[in-house]
């Protein structure tokens, strides 16, 4: 069997890297004969972090080219794509509506052809399908449907769902994939609250917890060993922080309020006799400098 794992992972972010590594380790443990290719928006840094070959994401490259198009026509096309491209793709998948006869960008056609090489597609988590990220998040899934390939969505958090066009695509994609495996229950609550189909939902975990610990052959570097020694001295809680934007307005809070609340949490942890270590889970590679993911243990 030949699988393709795709999604917005390992972009200089150790949390995303752990999500992918956990899935790869689990597949290797359960079905070592399976051939697995990995695709990322940032193949060079991802390959370095994972210590394995990684393919570039052609849809991401196409999006960058379209967004950087110069001149008046370039700007007009960008507006039209933003408004109609996802509807054209959905019409192609369902073979319905007037938009199904409109030509799609060559990058989509080439990507569908690439997907035909695989037996199944896995779109790995974590928080990828968020309405504030927009409808382009569904392009890989729609292309998988056009290629008529099984699509498994593993280890996801989804929602909120407060945009009509986003909800339309979420309903179709989540209802037609082979499985939508969620890593927590809050996403399921959001889906039910917004009337998003839950027929394909399964309860799962964050695949980062499936990473092989490599106890026998693990050799920590100087920095890692330093923090391991620090954590061994007393009871320890590790935290990671983030910049809230653009979610601060959605959450009805501010960066300052978030930081003040977190400082209160830290003080209570200290009062319980723990030490607190703040860790960055991001590398800064490929311009990904936001420390906004879980601590990947």
Sequence positions of predicted segments:
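Active-site anion-handling motifs in enzyme catalytic cores
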Residues: 1-297
């Amino acid at each position: 069997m030949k699988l393709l794992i795709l999604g917005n992972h390992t972009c200089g972010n150790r949390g995303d890297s752990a999500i992918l590594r956990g899935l790869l380790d689990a597949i290797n443990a359960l079905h070592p004969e399976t051939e697995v290719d990995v695709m990322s928006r940032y193949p060079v840094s991802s390959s370095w972090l994972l210590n394995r070959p990684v393919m570039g994401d052609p849809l991401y490259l196409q999006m960058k080219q379209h967004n950087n198009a110069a001149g008046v026509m370039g700007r007009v096309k960008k507006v039209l794509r933003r408004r109609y491209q996802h509807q054209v793709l959905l019409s192609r998948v369902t073979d319905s509506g007037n938009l199904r006869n409109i030509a799609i960008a060559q990058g989509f056609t080439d990507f569908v052809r690439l997907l035909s090489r695989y037996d199944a597609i896995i779109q790995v988590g974590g928080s990828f399908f968020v309405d504030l990220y927009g409808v382009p998040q569904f392009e890989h899934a729609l292309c998988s449907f056009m290629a008529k390939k099984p699509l498994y969505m593993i280890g996801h958090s989804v929602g909120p769902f407060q945009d009509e066009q986003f909800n339309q695509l979420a309903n179709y994609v989540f209802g037609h994939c082979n499985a939508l495996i969620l890593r927590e229950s809050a996403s399921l609550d959001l889906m039910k609250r917004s009337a998003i189909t839950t027929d394909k939902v399964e309860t799962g975990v964050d695949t980062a917890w499936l990473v092989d610990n490599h106890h026998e052959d693990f050799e920590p570097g100087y920095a890692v060993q330093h923090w391991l020694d620090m954590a061994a001295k007393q009871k320890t809680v590790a935290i990671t922080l983030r910049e809230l934007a653009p979610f601060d307005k959605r959450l009805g809070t501010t960066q300052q309020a978030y930081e003040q609340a977190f400082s209160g949490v830290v003080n209570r942890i200290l009062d319980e006799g723990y030490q607190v270590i703040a860790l960055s889970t991001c590398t800064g590679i490929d311009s990904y400098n936001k420390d906004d993911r879980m601590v990947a243990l």
